[in-house]
């Protein structure tokens, strides 16, 4: 499982700003009013191909035990108890407070690895600030100004050193021959019912009450001579609808499962169409770059007219992922399961396909000759060569000149061309564009004294004419 880092501290110390800086997003609402982050935000910090970890932005811990503030406090404590590393955030401008002392007291009871992070260090005397917080007894204190991105590189370096290679949760699977499939979707869409139908026995608790599955549950399966690990995840729902502390933390488990799976099966309810919650789940799968199969559940309960309407709606709402196969199923009655597994196999094989440098360069050459990049302000981007850079998803690095000016429409053309040429079905395709460095960029051509004299003689000759 991905390691988990929790940001914990009293209200308005800058946890959400740090979260946005680490995850390179604006997902956490940032405001000067204390207590703006009432729920937990979850994101993935991707430093490079090998270093990923989950970040949890908790609401500020307040003194109240009742009402919204009390619920926020319980959420923060739940996040801290599950974390592989806690970043205890304090405010350099306000200094230490009685509430900081109380938070530190229960953090020590948790016995989780904890790092003191002093935020808003800009405009303060850093030595004085460090002296004030020295009484907390941390062997090392990190100072940052998240709003100005000051000290973040040192923070990331320290976090990576302190995190385990794998999170404290159960490892999903390391068997390369076993396909890891995560069934994801909003609550009560039929994920547990589908897994139970595949297994042929009721291993998951399935009911009509949304949110019955509170954690991600993994079950091994052998079917038609192939091995699988099926992961039934808790449903991802709108934050305003997530009320219980236990259920809130299940979102972390779901995101970890998506990051660790090889193929994500997104389940939709044919009777309700594609909702905003479905789009949120789909976004999490796309952010992780996982192979995708869309399972349209409860298809058997639709009339012919309703099916036509549903097909039109699906083509409109899912038009931005035309590469993902969609399968019509009934989790309750088991129809469509064989085609679902075939789609999973195609997506898995495409996502993990290997390529030679020669074949991808031939593809780039044909794509370039068939449809060269358009001229932008009198200049044309040139694609020199390409090489494969990884799988799940298939990734290609394209080298050339003026690639920063390459239009998004042309990048989509390359993606579609490679997808069609190599028959890549059910998987995202990633392109990374790199320009060669110009050794003379930013340098001014300084003339020698002899060149200056020659230039003067030439100018006199021109003027004389």
From Swiss-Prot:
GO biological-process terms attached to the record: ribosome biogenesis
Binding site for GTP 1: 9-16, 57-61, 119-122
Binding-site residues, GTP 2: 185-192, 232-236, 297-300
Pfam families from the UniProt entry: KH_dom-like (PF14714), MMR_HSR1 (PF01926)
Domain KH-like: 353-437
EngA-type G domain boundaries: 3-167, 179-352
Molecular-function GO terms, alphabetical: GTP binding; ribosome binding
InterPro entries (UniProt xref): G_ENGA, GTP-bd, GTPase_Der, KH_dom-like, KH_dom-like_a/b, P-loop_NTPase, Small_GTP-bd
Keywords associated with the record: GTP-binding, Nucleotide-binding, Repeat, Ribosome biogenesis
Role of this protein: GTPase that plays an essential role in the late steps of ribosome biogenesis.
Family: Belongs to the TRAFAC class TrmE-Era-EngA-EngB-Septin-like GTPase superfamily. EngA (Der) GTPase family.
Assembly: Associates with the 50S ribosomal subunit.
PANTHER family: GTPASE DER
Stated name of the protein: GTPase Der
């Amino acid at each position: 499982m991905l390691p988990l880092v929790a940001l914990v501290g009293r209200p308005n110390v800058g946890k959400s700003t740090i979260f946005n800086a680490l995850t390179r997003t604006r997902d956490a609402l940032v405001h000067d009013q204390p207590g703006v982050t009432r729920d937990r935000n979850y994101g993935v910090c991707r430093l490079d191909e090998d270093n990923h970890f989950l970040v949890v932005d908790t609401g500020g811990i307040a003194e109240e035990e009742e009402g919204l503030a009390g619920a926020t406090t319980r959420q923060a404590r739940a996040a801290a108890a599950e974390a592989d590393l806690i970043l205890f955030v304090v405010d350099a401008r306000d200094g230490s407070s009685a509430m900081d002392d109380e938070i530190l007291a229960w953090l020590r009871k948790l016995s989780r690895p904890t790092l003191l992070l002093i935020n808003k260090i800009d405009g303060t005397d850093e030595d004085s600030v460090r002296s004030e917080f020295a009484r907390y007894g941390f062997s090392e204190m990190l100072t940052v100004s998240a709003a100005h991105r000051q000290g973040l590189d040192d923070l990331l370096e320290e976090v990576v050193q302190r995190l385990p290679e794998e999170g404290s949760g159960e490892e999903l699977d390391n068997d390369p021959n076993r396909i890891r499939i995560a069934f994801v979707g909003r609550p009560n869409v039929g994920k547990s019912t589908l897994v139970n139908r595949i297994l042929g026995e009721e291993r998951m608790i399935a009911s009509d009450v949304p949110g019955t599955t509170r954690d991600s549950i993994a079950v091994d399966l052998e079917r038609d001579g192939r091995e699988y690990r099926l992961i039934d995840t808790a449903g991802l729902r709108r934050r305003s609808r997530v009320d219980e502390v236990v259920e809130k933390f299940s979102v972390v488990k779901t995101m970890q499962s998506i990051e660790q799976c090889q193929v994500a099966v997104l389940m939709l309810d044919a009777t309700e169409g594609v909702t905003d919650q479905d789009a949120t789940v789909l976004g999490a799968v796309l952010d992780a770059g996982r192979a995708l199969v869309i399972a349209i559940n409860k298809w058997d309960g639709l009339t012919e007219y309703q099916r036509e309407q549903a097909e039109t709606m699906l083509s409109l709402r899912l038009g931005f992922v035309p590469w993902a196969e969609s399968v019509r199923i009934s989790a309750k009655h088991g129809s469509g399961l064989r085609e679902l597994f075939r789609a999973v196999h195609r997506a898995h094989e495409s996502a993990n396909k290997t390529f030679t440098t020669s074949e991808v360069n031939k593809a780039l050459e044909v794509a370039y000759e068939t449809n060269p990049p358009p001229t932008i302000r009198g200049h044309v981007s040139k694609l020199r060569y390409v090489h494969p850079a990884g799988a799940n998803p298939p990734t290609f690095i394209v080298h050339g000149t003026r690639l920063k000016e390459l239009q998004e429409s042309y990048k989509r053309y390359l993606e579609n061309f490679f997808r069609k040429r190599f028959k890549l079905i059910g998987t995202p395709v990633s392109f990374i564009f790199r320009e060669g460095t110009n050794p003379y960029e930013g340098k001014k051509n300084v003339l020698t004294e002899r060149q200056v004299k020659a230039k003067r003689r030439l100018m006199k000759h021109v003027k004389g004419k």
